[in-house]
A protein has these predicted regions:
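Solvent-exposed loop/turn segments at secondary-structure junctions
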Residues: 36, 161-164, 182-186, 245-250
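Cell-wall glycan-active module
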Residues: 1-158, 223, 227-229, 256-308
């Protein structure tokens, strides 16, 4: 099933499936061919390979909201170049001819025998960085506009969606920064535009909208909810945790109450190291504790990456 880091799609007849893992950098395509009487295994194989080629080509050329393929420059042709929509057909043919195509016999729910063919290919090793570069100008622009640390924005996007603009979670949260229409997106929109609006998934999938709102939400956490915190490092620890679990849970962890003034006082009396220790051990959800650590590690990486 799909997750923010993994895009799974089925064709209408459910006879083919593709899965793109944006975290691991793997693309898997599978097709199911009916094993009709009189069909030789050679015919079945040919049919399976043609269907695999078509499905693989479809995945490689799938457009992002900016109409560029989502996987642009992320698949190598094996000869030092990268695959474009123009070369995708030839590439798909080559992959199916040369890679290890897995074959297995299955019996479907209707009792009919079928053959499943699948193939897996790897993206280039720096696929995450390539996607990050695509949104870099916009992230820097909005970080500056909202007075927030861009390295933290990159780290949050990496952790939320691995820079998959079509990311969707079960919540559902949408897009690069995994915004929830009823909470984070709504809060951010009213922070910028001073009016209440429930935004559609379609709106949130568009990277410029998503980055604008995500950065605005980080800004509101940093400068409004946690604006009373004097130390920048401590305030960002609270902001990162708040992005994942909401400011109320952070305040409760720090001061036993959701009152932000009490939270600021509790935080201001301690060092950033103490704040980190409390949050990473006492936040109500293990997921948020892990999230804080991951985002901080990645923000160090992006801080040096942005200087390159």
């Amino acid at each position: 099933s799909s997750s923010p880091q993994k895009m799974v799609s089925y064709d209408d007849d459910l006879n083919s499936r593709s899965s793109v893992d944006f975290e691991k950098g793997e693309i898997e395509v599978e097709v199911i061919i009916e094993d009709t009487p009189g069909k030789t295994s050679q015919q079945s194989q040919e049919e399976g390979e043609i269907a695999l080629e078509k499905k693989l080509q479809k995945v490689i050329t799938l457009p992002a909201p900016d109409n560029q393929p989502i996987l642009k420059d992320q698949i190598a042709d094996g000869e030092g170049g990268s695959i474009s929509p123009k070369t995708s057909k030839v590439f798909a043919k080559k992959v199916v001819a040369t890679e290890a195509v897995q074959k297995s016999n299955i019996t479907a729910k209707d009792g009919k025998p079928r053959v499943k063919y699948s193939v897996t290919i790897k993206m280039v090793p720096n696929h995450i960085e390539i996607r990050a570069k695509r949104f870099k100008a916009n992230i820097l622009k909005q970080s500056k506009r909202f007075k927030i640390d861009p390295a933290i924005v990159f780290a949050i996007i990496h952790t939320e969606s691995s820079f998959n603009p079509k990311a969707r979670s079960h919540v559902p949260a949408y897009g690069l920064m995994q915004l929830v229409p009823k909470s984070g997106a709504r809060d951010a929109y009213s922070y910028i535009y001073k009016r209440d609006k429930l935004l559609s998934a379609q709106y949130l999938y568009i990277p410029v909208n998503n980055i604008e709102l995500g950065c605005a939400y980080i800004s509101k956490l940093r400068h409004v909810y946690f604006g009373g915190i004097k130390n920048d490092e401590s305030a960002y620890y609270c902001t990162i945790a708040g992005y994942n679990t909401g400011p109320g849970n952070v305040a409760k962890t720090m001061s036993g109450t959701t009152k932000l003034i009490a939270n600021a006082n509790a935080v201001n009396g301690k060092t950033p190291e103490q704040i980190f220790k409390i949050l990473s051990n006492k936040l109500p959800y293990v997921e948020t504790r892990k999230y804080l650590v991951k985002v901080l590690e990645r923000s160090n990486y992006y801080r040096s990456w942005l200087k390159m």
